[in-house]
């Protein structure tokens, strides 16, 4: 039986209607959420603000990286205000070996991005880039679709303060930090991951 998730946009997003999303279909999840004009926010960052849905918890902020938590899984959000300010274009090549690989370029949106999901052992590595921000996670198959749903909400609600960012770009510290956490490089080979295993077989983040 297909699972359906009822999304109350009155409380969560635009306040227009109740939408049912087939959560077995990643394309549908992404397309429906990105088709809305999401304007709510409940978190502030340095030069931007964004919204995290009910059930997602903000754990910590380390410079430009935000650690989020949902249903036993961690999501890592990085917002690239430098790329936003300079309107940096993205390069993406569809990965035919990935579990899911798709470029995002909706006709009615100026924002661009991509989603890539790669299966590693019994887990799924999610690499979701949209609106000059990235969410990464390593999740179980059971949590994959809800992770994509939450990531789509979060990335689509990011709003930038260009004036404040311009002031911040004069800060050498910020530029150094942006370089340190330069996660916005597309990997041409499937074996390259930001997530790596250590000698004991534990997953570690490489940044």
Located regions from the model:
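Positively charged n-region of N-terminal signal peptides that target proteins for export
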Residues: 1-4
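Short, conserved catalytic or interaction motifs in soluble domains
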Residues: 18
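N-terminal "mature-domain start" segment
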Residues: 23-64
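Surface-exposed amphipathic alpha-helical segments
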Residues: 137-207
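C-terminal motif of bacterial Sec signal peptides marking the signal peptidase cleavage site
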Residues: 14-15
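Conserved polar/disulfide-associated segments of primarily extracytoplasmic proteins
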Residues: 60-147
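Sec-dependent N-terminal signal peptides
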Residues: 6-9
């Amino acid at each position: 039986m297909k699972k359906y998730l009822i999304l109350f946009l009155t409380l969560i997003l635009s306040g227009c209607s109740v939408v049912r999303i087939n959560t077995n279909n990643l394309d549908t999840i992404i397309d429906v959420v990105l088709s809305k004009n999401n304007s709510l926010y409940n978190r502030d960052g340095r030069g931007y603000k964004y919204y995290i849905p009910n059930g997602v918890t903000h754990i910590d902020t380390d410079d430009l990286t935000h650690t989020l938590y949902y249903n036993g899984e961690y999501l890592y959000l990085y917002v690239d205000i430098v790329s936003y300010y300079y309107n940096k274009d993205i390069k993406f090549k569809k990965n035919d070996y990935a579990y899911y690989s798709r470029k995002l370029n909706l006709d009615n949106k100026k924002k661009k991005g991509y989603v890539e999901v790669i299966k590693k052992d019994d887990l799924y590595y999610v690499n979701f880039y949209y609106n000059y921000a990235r969410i990464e996670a390593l999740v179980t198959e059971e949590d994959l679709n809800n992770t994509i749903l939450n990531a789509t909400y979060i990335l689509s609600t990011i709003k930038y303060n260009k004036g404040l960012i311009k002031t911040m770009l004069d800060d050498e510290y910020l530029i150094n930090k942006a370089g340190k956490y330069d996660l916005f490089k597309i990997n041409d080979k499937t074996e390259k991951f930001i997530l790596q295993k250590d000698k004991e077989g534990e997953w570690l983040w490489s940044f």
